[in-house]
Structure formats: C-alpha cells, structure tokens
Amino acid sequence: METAKFVEIFKENYTAVSEIANNYQEVRKEIINEFFKNVKDILENDLKDKYSIELNSVAYRPIIIKNTTSQDKKWKNFYFTVEFQKSSMYSMPFVGFRKDDDKEVKVSDFDKPNITQLEEQTKYFLAYGKLFDDDICKNIIVDKLSPEDFAGTIKGILEQFEKYNLVERN
C-alpha cells in the first residue's frame, strides 16, 4: 500500500491506529497465549493419561509436554516443547525433545531418534524440527493456523516417540 494511503487511513482513524501501535506486542502475545491455551486443552483432553502439559506464557517456550508413563528411564531426561528462536517476536518455532535443564545428561550420549519432522540435533535438543520460518501470530491470523491442526501435529510426533526406543551411545 502506498504511503499516501496509510496517511489517509491514519488521519481518519488516529485513535484506533495509535492504540494498535501502542499495544501491538501485548495484543500479539495475548493471541499467541490464547492459541497455546487452546492447544493445551485439546492435548489434555486427548493425552491426559500419558502426558503432563504445562503452559508458560512469559517465556520463549510456551508449552512443555512430559511423558508420565514411559517405562524407559532415559526418556525422563527429555521433554517435548515448542521453542521460539526469536522469543521477543514469537518467530521461527521449533518443536522437539529438549533435555531437561535440571538433569545431568548430554544429548551427544544418545542417538538421534528417527522421528519424522525432527531431523536436527543440538546440545540442547535430542531431536527438533522447524515448523515454519515465520511469525506464529501471522500464521494464526493470516494463514488460519488452528489449535486443532497444531495439536494434531504434536500428537503425530508424540505417537512416533512412543514407538521409539531411545538408544544410548557407548
């Protein structure tokens, strides 16, 4: 849109434009928090017998999912999460299995699980993948990313995880 058109809109809607500009980040945060609350509700309804699900609205890691039933003690060192690489902008969300910071474990001591969508590994992530490069708020509003679809993606990854036997390197 041309600058002249923006000026015209600004003049006609000064109060609304000013409020939007002043509250832009807070409104984005609220949209994202509501989205993840809905994702949590869906996941809890479907997975409550196997997983504990926590929300964290102030951090770059808005949702944390821990397996509560796995008999494999090695998996207790990791949890599933969504983590924003640009936390202040809620951009570049990664999903994957992150090491628990409270546990004395090295990711490099384990083989990377063969889980679709989680192709990478770092010193913090046992396995992770990037969902999209963009701002999640834009994906929610413009691309109509729904909590149901996002929860479905997470459930699909967790189903693969349940079948995987974590292998510790010698």
Residue ranges and their predicted role:
Residues 1:
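Contiguous mid-protein beta-loop-alpha structural module that forms a pocket-lining wall or clamp
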Residues 11-136:
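Polyanion-binding interface signature
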Residues 17, 142-170:
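Long, solvent-exposed, polar/charged low-complexity segments
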